[in-house]
Amino acid sequence: MINVEYKHTQVAAKKKLGQNFLTDRNITRKTVLLSGAKPDDQVVEIGPGFGALTRELVEECHNLTVIEKDPTLATFIRNEYPQIKVIEGDVLTINFSAMAQAGKPLQILGNIPYSITSPILFHLLEHRRAFRSATLMMQHEVALRLAAKPATKEYGILAVQMQAFCKVEYLFKVSRKVFKPQPKVESAVIKLTPHATDPALDADGFRRFVRIAFHQRRKTLLNNLKESYNLELVDSNKLQLRAEALSIEELLELFSLIKTKSE
């Protein structure tokens, strides 16, 4: 562990919590600006740490809630910013839908832990009707996978599941040199904006279909899907392709033509 001290509060940066603290204020200002958060929005920050992003949000937003798992950091934020609400707990247990008051969607921001980036993204996907946008800093490699296009090595389950239900924007890259302790990898900021309507009536069924279609990337769609689905309505030529060759629209169309073998 590396000890990090700020304003007489010292924490041992915990690798299991993915704690890397941002030190460049230009990055936090840019993140808040591109998030589009307005003064009257209900804003939620994930993982404030020592408050690098919190400081900018407090200046811009009147209704801010932060979620912090580390007790020492949660206490620090309470003392430093007594005007905001602090939820001390695991973001993966947070019911964002319940937080969206009177049907007013949240604006979510955060420098999310590398160690649980994918679980956080899928948790947000479950609560996509609760937020207007989520502007998140994450590992650069994951950001590339999120924004990936078909027929690339990065294109897979994460890209398809997130892009099917949200507009995904890669905003900018962040050097590892602006963090303490310095991580081994670069970061990036992305923005997720949920689509107004879901592209598939059975959203959970589509997400399961995507996992099966990409389960073994080197196999054709036919080989990946035949055990789980009735494929008689699907063009046989298309079934000879790999999932990575199909756009999200094509995967949605394919999903509309198949039925699970239990149906």
Swiss-Prot record:
Catalysed conversion reaction: adenosine(1518)/adenosine(1519) in 16S rRNA + 4 S-adenosyl-L-methionine = N(6)-dimethyladenosine(1518)/N(6)-dimethyladenosine(1519) in 16S rRNA + 4 S-adenosyl-L-homocysteine + 4 H(+)
Record family assignment: Belongs to the class I-like SAM-binding methyltransferase superfamily. rRNA adenine N(6)-methyltransferase family. RsmA subfamily.
Subcellular location: Cytoplasm
Gene3D superfamilies referenced in this protein's UniProt entry, alphabetically: Ribosomal RNA adenine dimethylase-like, domain 2, Vaccinia Virus protein VP39
InterPro entries the UniProt entry points to: KsgA/Erm, rRNA_Ade_diMease-like_C, rRNA_Ade_Mease_Trfase_CS, rRNA_Ade_methylase_Trfase_N, rRNA_adenine_dimethylase, SAM-dependent_MTases_sf
Organism name: Chlorobium chlorochromatii (strain CaD3)
Protein name in the entry: Ribosomal RNA small subunit methyltransferase A
The organism's place on the tree of life at top rank: Bacteria
Ligand binding (S-adenosyl-L-methionine): N20, L22, G47, E68, D90, N111
Originating gene: rsmA
